Amino acid sequence: MRRSLIVDTHASSCYFRTSIGGDGRKALIQITERCNLHCAHCFVSSGDWGDHMRFEDIVERVLPRLKRARVERLTLTGGEPFVHPAIMEICAVVADMGWPLGICTNATQTTDEQIGRLAALGNVHINVSFDGFRAESHGKFRGNQASFATTVATTRKFAEAGLLQGLLSTPNALTEVEEFTALCEFAVEVGAEYVLMNPLSSFGRGVKSQSRLAADADKMRAIRAVTERFRERGLDLVHIRFPNDELPLGGCDIGKLIYVFVNGQLALCPYIVFAARTPQSKYPDTEFLAGNIFEDEVGPTLDAYDFHSRYTVGANMKCGSCRMNGACGKGCPAAIIANGGYIGEVDREQCPVPDGSKRLLQIGQPAA
């Protein structure tokens, strides 16, 4: 059963919008490393290179093992999923196995025939990336200004086919605040369920681009202000890791939201592995990988892993003395790692309590 991670009482500190209740899981599968665009923020630094996951591996190993690991929902990602030569065959197998299927796409590589076939499968939804709402912003940020018109046109087709679920956006220095009003107007027009916005973070290509292309706090606050009014028009506004002035932080659902890399490596959470692969990380990525799904069953490893027994979040003096300590989930460990910190330190990008001191003494350490 899907469970919302967005609640009014806490800051939306996790990069995910939803998780899974009970003992189920959600899985994202990187079916290809390749992408026709070159986005400035790409978590996995995709481009016109890299591997596709073999269809045979997906059908014979990945999907059956995820099913046995109690995965209830699947999302295909990349790279750009629609450059995979077997994308439609993969979707058909997933549908036959009874899974709800999501696809995250830049909406530049999907044909009308594919849209029709996806609609016929049923229980498929599409999320489209819009990083701004002009060719000069979205297109430039994604390495191809002409891509914007194609993305808009294809998104309309997804909507007409009943496939469109959400629009995903990374506010950045190339975007104007007013573009997010236009983006939300477009979302309402085409019947999108939600618009999810999250900052340009220090993962993948963002390690180098964040300092020059990230939207500053004032712009993020302004974007929140101009988009909030669309709630009354039925649009769900999801402001991930926007500036937070007063709320306790959300927590971490690591192990419930897993990610299969194109080479079969299984991440306990994609973002924490993306963070561990940055130059500033204090952790090896293997600390957050649960083996290789091409080689072994992954359910037992996932069941045995308990992040919160290995690490203590909020293990620092500031959190310990905070009046919100009991209610606070301590934010996102991946964000802390991506900023060069240790798990247990303060998620400074989200913490609403002013920090008058220098870096806090590290208390939590990696488990042996």
Set out the residue ranges of the language-model regions:
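C-terminal accessory region of radical SAM enzymes
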Residues: 217-245, 272-323
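Conserved alpha-helical substructure of the radical SAM core
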Residues: 2-122
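Residue-level recognition of short loop/turn positions
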Residues: 38, 262-263
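Short, small/polar residue-rich loop motifs at catalytic or cofactor-binding pockets
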Residues: 250-255
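Conserved radical SAM core fold
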Residues: 36, 81-83, 107-112, 124, ...
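Short glycine-enriched, charge-decorated loop/helix-capping segments at active-site entrances
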Residues: 45-52, 140-146, 210-214, 338
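Conserved C-terminal portion of the radical SAM core fold
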Residues: 69-75, 95-102, 123-127, 149-240
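Radical SAM enzyme core and accessory elements
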Residues: 1-21, 263, 269, 274-288, ...
